[in-house]
Amino acid sequence: MSDSHHKPVWDRTHHAKMATGIGDPQCFKGMAGKSKFNVGDRVRIKDLPDLFYTRTMTYTRGATGTIVRLVYESPAAEDEAFGNEENVEWFYSIVFAQKDLWPEYSDTFANDTLETEIPERYLEKA
């Protein structure tokens, strides 16, 4: 069997080569354009379909939270897993009240929050 039968469909080391000496996600800095949302904005998490992997947890979908930080620019995991690095987007750090995610959450801990990073495609104005 010749070596040509063992070559990957795409260069799986492309991303590592691109990030060498710069870092990831820093290698995507400036590629997402202007952010759609800002710190302090209230956003609702869309319930978009996903194939096998997403950074957007199911329990956040449909919930409303507050953006506390624009974290970085990067392709979403759903795209990057298939070698699609053209769709660079903003990732936001969003804070949710635990009670908004789990209504049965004890009132004893009413001030508890959860903070997570979510890509822009999953966000809409609340």
From Swiss-Prot:
It catalyses: thiocyanate + H2O + 2 H(+) = carbonyl sulfide + NH4(+). This is Thiocyanate hydrolase subunit alpha. The lineage of its organism: Bacteria, Pseudomonadati, Pseudomonadota, Betaproteobacteria, Nitrosomonadales. It comes from the Bacteria. Pathway: Organosulfur degradation; thiocyanate degradation. The keyword Hydrolase applies. The keyword Nucleotide-binding does not apply. Involved in the degradation of thiocyanate. Keywords: Hydrolase. GO terms for biological process: thiocyanate catabolic process. Heterododecamer consisting of 4 alpha, 4 beta, and 4 gamma subunits. Its EC number is 3.5.5.8. One of its GO terms (molecular function) is thiocyanate hydrolase activity.
